[in-house]
Amino acid sequence: NMAIPTFNAVGFCAHYSKQGDWAFDTALELSKANNKRLNVFHFLNDPFDHNEIKNRNLSHSEIERLAIKKEKELRLYYDERAGEYLDVGFRVCYDNSWTELHRCLLVREFQLLVLAYIKEDAFFAGKPIKEFADNFISPVILVGPDKPEHLSFNSRAVLLAPGLGLDKDKWQESEIVYI
């Protein structure tokens, strides 16, 4: 008798792009369908950009100011996209290193993570995004890169898939890729 895996929240890593919007909408739909909180994460050092080592020589107070500014932008942008759905939380993470990401994304709860799959050779947290998804401890769904219906599931997300309440017309089996 295998325990049905559950999750406590849906996590989404902010990305201002077409695929980022698709991923947010998917995360929002999953939150609504499962009556779960949607956590929107923003990293001061973008985990999608594996060349980025910005903010290294900023002072602590400058980083704090930047974080506050980013969080404001984040709230404005995604509150509007979330519409009536109010169970949305925002969290700014300071570093895009693997450990910080892990700490930030696994904060106190087991989350289903939804990420924008921006392009075939996209990176996330310093490794190819499919490799990241495959190795990550939580269930991960990638959205994109070509259309919003194109979802890729890691092995942990596959176990959740039947109970997620995803709109069947929108996600045909053919679009679902197992990493």
Regions found by a protein language model. Give the residues of each.
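Short, surface-exposed amphipathic charged segments that create phosphate/polyanion-binding patches used
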Residues: 105-106, 154-160
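A short acidic, amphipathic alpha-helical/loop segment
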Residues: 22-26, 100-104, 127-131
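A short acidic, glycine-rich active-site loop
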Residues: 58-72
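Small/aliphatic-rich secondary-structure junction motif
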Residues: 3-57, 135, 144-146, 158-179
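A conditional alpha-helix N-cap/helix-loop micro-motif detector
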Residues: 20, 71, 94-95, 122
